[in-house]
Regions:
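C-terminal substrate-binding subdomain of Rossmann-fold SDR/epimerase-dehydratase oxidoreductases
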Residues: 28, 196-325
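Structural element of the ATP-grasp superfamily
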Residues: 109, 159, 192, 285-287
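N-terminal Rossmann-like NAD(P)+-binding domain of SDR-like oxidoreductases, especially those catalyzing
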Residues: 1-178, 310-311, 325
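Short beta-loop-alpha junction of Rossmann-like oxidoreductase domains
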Residues: 130-132, 181-183, 187, 285
Length: 325
């Protein structure tokens, strides 16, 4: 990705799971990277510790118009907009936070933020919701089933509208479920891994619902690949493997790979309301451009389990910064 060398890039959500991996990759490619973080939050972020001296930190609250206006005199080649409230289940309890973090932040950035040449909007597969046609195609009408999905879709639409009005170069990306090192334990894969490593009882639904899970390096590869290939598109682009797995099989794989003695109680829990039974990416477009995942699901899962084995005692420490991921 030599095209990124010396490019001035702003990453929102750069202290988050996907964002921090993106920032590290951009630094590796010798881009001039700035990261927006909430006030006084960077000191508590273990994800960026190793590259603090190689990035520029901008403290701002993207939900606050006046705060964003303070960046108006800055100029960047790209904004990678990843900042979001991104917990699907909890989004039902925190609707206003979803609106503020997922929608208002986008509106503020596009209307009051830095001068930019290109805006890369990081969406989500949750925009699709329940669909009749599998795998999910960007041509199908979105049907989000959570406040998270609704607000991320609205954010995408606002970005498209702004692009049409101002001729701003835009990419709207829809990555499917992602996993890897440094992910919050609120996500299903690290949650199950940590329970397996402690040999705790694991209670799940029947696990018939299917999801595809993409190793983080593959998603970052896809994001940067498509940004390099396509200057502008108001049509969203899926990033995913097109290889779904039933949740019950996922749990059993983690249990096996971690050599856990945890008791599995599959079928113990009820399905959540508005359960999405199948999520699978139609990835024909990005594959047709020459991208494909480099790391298989099973290898990525083993790498991730090994990482959590190294750090799980840190996760268990109530005072650990990892608890804030």
């Amino acid at each position: 990705m030599n095209n990124l060398k010396n490019k001035k890039i702003l990453v929102t959500g750069g202290a988050g799971f996907i964002g921090s991996h993106l920032v590290k990759r951009l630094v590796e490619y010798k881009a001039r990277v700035s990261v927006v973080v909430k006030y006084n939050s960077i000191i508590d972020c273990p994800r960026l510790v190793k590259i603090w001296d190689k990035i520029n930190i901008i403290e701002a609250d993207l939900r606050n118009t006046d705060s964003v206006r303070e960046m108006n005199n800055l100029r960047f080649d790209y904004i990678f907009h990843l900042a979001a409230y991104n917990h699907v289940g909890d989004s039902f309890k925190h609707i206003y936070e979803n609106v503020n973090s997922n929608l208002l932040s986008t509106i503020n950035l596009l209307n009051h933020g830095p001068k930019i040449k290109k805006f890369i909007h990081m969406g989500t597969s949750e925009i699709y919701g329940i669909q009749k046609k599998i795998p999910f195609d960007v041509k199908e009408k979105p049907n989000p089933m959570s406040p998270y999905g609704v607000t991320k879709y609205a954010s995408e639409l606002i970005s498209i509208l702004k692009s049409k009005q101002t001729k701003l170069d835009l990419l709207c990306l829809r990555p499917f479920n992602t996993f890897g090192p440094y992910q919050s334990e609120k996500a299903i894969i690290p949650e199950i891994i940590l329970k397996c490593l402690q040999n705790k009882e694991i209670k799940t639904t029947e696990g018939k619902q299917t999801r595809e899970f993409n190793y983080i390096d593959n998603i970052i590869d896809g994001l940067l690949f498509i940004n390099n290939k396509i200057k502008h598109s108001i049509d969203p682009i899926n990033i995913g493997s097109n290889k779904p797995i039933p949740i019950k099989n996922l749990v059993r794989k983690i249990h096996s790979y971690s050599r856990s003695s945890s008791k599995l109680k599959i079928g113990y829990l009820k399905y959540r309301p508005n359960e999405i039974w199948k999520m699978q990416a139609n990835n024909k477009f990005i594959v047709s451009k020459g991208w494909k995942p480099k790391i298989s699901f099973d290898l990525g899962l083993k790498i991730t389990i090994n990482w959590y084995q190294d750090f799980y005692k840190t996760y268990l420490n109530k005072n650990s910064l990892f608890k804030k991921l």
